[in-house]
Regions:
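Surface loop/turn motifs at the tips and blade-to-blade linkers of beta-strand repeat domains
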Residues: 27-38, 74-78, 142-147, 190-196
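Structural motif
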Residues: 9-15, 57-62, 104-108, 124-130, ...
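Blade-terminus and WD-like Trp-Asp/Gly-His loop motifs, strongest in beta-propeller folds
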Residues: 1-2, 42-50, 55, 85-93, ...
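Blade-loop segments of beta-propeller domains
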Residues: 8-54
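Short loop/turn segments that connect beta-strands within beta-propeller blades
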Residues: 17-21, 65-68, 133-137, 181-185
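Beta-propeller domains
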Residues: 141-212
Length: 212
């Protein structure tokens, strides 16, 4: 089991061996200046490779869970805010959502009180869904729009399917959950709002990769 822990005023990734209870530190990262910071809410683990993936600043890194060595898969250019990542079912790609960095326009601190959350939603930042190869050969933009995108979730069984969300106040976004076929580029509403003020969120895939 992988967990994040704050120790000695630093945030790092740790492995917990469930049978013995032994904890091992897996990363040794220096703190980053705000508005960037080290946090593993956005990390993911491959089902096919002994690797975990996480953002460190603007770098998407791969961590070998045995050798504890890291490598940089991709670097996002400045002016963007990186968000959730998820691995494809076959382990060949990491998918990520990114959006325009709004911190120069108003105060942003989502992790401490959702500061700037509503303002970011109202600003409708340009957002993208990226596909990044785990072999280090680079990444590409699959989809973009002027609406705050977050929570890219890949099907655990079907390489071509993922969901993403329109981020913002759940009861006010135009539609929370969207599906995407990364092979055809088709995008559709997974579940349209059924009544005014309805709030939908925190969607996850079932293990069959067909239902959320």
């Amino acid at each position: 089991l992988l967990v994040a822990s704050d120790r000695d005023n630093r945030t790092n990734l740790f492995g917990l061996e469930l049978h013995s209870g032994q904890i091992q530190q897996l990363t040794d990262l220096n703190p980053l200046p705000l508005p960037r910071e080290v946090e593993f809410l956005r990390a993911c683990v491959s089902d096919t490779r002994d690797e975990a993936y996480f953002w460190y600043g603007m770098e998407l890194r791969a961590l070998d869970l045995h050798r504890l060595e890291t490598r940089v898969l991709y670097r996002m250019e400045d002016g963007w805010d990186v968000s959730m990542i998820n691995c494809s079912a076959d382990g060949r790609h990491v998918y990520a959502s990114v959006s325009e960095d709004m911190s120069s326009r108003f105060r942003v601190d989502y992790l401490r009180g959702y500061v700037g959350f509503r303002e970011t939603w109202a600003a409708r930042p340009l957002s993208r869904i990226l596909r990044i190869a785990v072999d280090g050969s680079g990444g590409q933009t699959l989809f973009e729009e002027s609406y705050w995108i977050g929570h890219v979730n890949t099907s655990p069984t079907r390489n071509e399917l993922l969901t993403f969300c329109h981020e913002g106040p759940w009861n006010e976004v135009d539609n929370r959950i969207w599906g995407m076929n990364v092979e055809t580029g088709a995008v559709w509403k997974i579940r349209a709002r059924q009544e005014e003020g309805e709030a939908v969120g925190h969607e996850y895939w079932h293990a069959d990769g067909e239902r959320i």
